Amino acid sequence: MDVTRLLLATLLVFLCFFTAYSHPPPEEKLRDDRSLRSNSSVNLLDFPSVSIMALNKNSKQISRKEAEKKRSSKKEASMKKVARPRTPLSAPCVATRDSCKPPAPACCDPCASCQCRFFRSACSCRVLSLNC
């Protein structure tokens, strides 16, 4: 009988704490639009003002030159990145670094051989000797 009363008292205290801490405090409650507008206008006045300055001719010319340099460097980089189209390989061989599991044909490169790893689950054509 004493154990059940102790258990019920503990449960009652837990529920009281849970209900007290589940509700937000009064200052965290949602406010209406009027109070939000008044608070936002007060907060904006606290920040320093932003000044806008006109650019002189020299700074405009420098910025234009920098922009042109960036454009030309981007064009050069795009020209350098153009990849050569791959030549189609003949069908009865496997290209270097491609999968070459045992039913596949031999490697196209005469210096390459088929290497398998992880109990022949991952096989690829690799060049073993550079002197070939």
From Swiss-Prot:
It is found in: Secreted. Its main location: secreted. Disulfide bonds join C93-C108, C100-C114, C107-C125, C111-C132, C116-C123. One of its GO terms (cellular component) is extracellular space. Residues 63-79 have a biased composition (Basic and acidic residues). The keyword Transmembrane does not apply. One of its GO terms (molecular function) is neuropeptide hormone activity. One of its GO terms (biological process) is melanosome organization. Residues 60-88 are annotated as: Disordered. Involved in the regulation of melanogenesis. The binding of ASP to MC1R precludes alpha-MSH initiated signaling and thus blocks production of cAMP, leading to a down-regulation of eumelanogenesis (brown/black pigment) and thus increasing synthesis of pheomelanin (yellow/red pigment). The presence of a 'disulfide through disulfide knot' structurally defines this protein as a knottin. This is Agouti-signaling protein. The lineage of its organism: Eukaryota, Metazoa, Chordata, Craniata, Vertebrata.
